[in-house]
């Protein structure tokens, strides 16, 4: 096994988000830049939108003359 080929690991790597939020984590890089974090992601902020796919199901049923009842 070769010595000294592993990348240097930084325990205090800084993660910077586009929204301005910063936090620390462990990484092989000193600084990480991300577009979305837990402070601005819709799932974590409660602004998540539920997509209704019922229209697609109804279109399929209409196309193949299927009824909702079995």
Swiss-Prot record:
InterPro entries assigned to the protein according to its UniProt record, in alphabetical order: Ribosomal_bL28/bL31-like_sf, Ribosomal_bL31, Ribosomal_bL31_A, Ribosomal_bL31_sf
Per UniProt, the keywords (alphabetical) are:
Metal-binding, Ribonucleoprotein, Ribosomal protein, RNA-binding, rRNA-binding, Zinc
Q: Which domain of life is it from?
A: Bacteria
Q: Detail which positions bind Zn(2+).
A: 17, 19, 37, 40
What biological-process terms (Gene Ontology) are attached? translation
Q: Which cofactor does it need?
A: Zn(2+)
What does the Swiss-Prot or TrEMBL cofactor note state?
A: Binds 1 zinc ion per subunit.
Q: Name one GO molecular function term.
A: structural constituent of ribosome
How is the quaternary structure described? Part of the 50S ribosomal subunit.
* Role, per record: Binds the 23S rRNA.
Which protein is depicted? Large ribosomal subunit protein bL31
- Native organism is Clostridium acetobutylicum (strain ATCC 824 / DSM 792 / JCM 1419 / IAM 19013 / LMG 5710 / NBRC 13948 / NRRL B-527 / VKM B-1787 / 2291 / W)
* Originating gene: rpmE
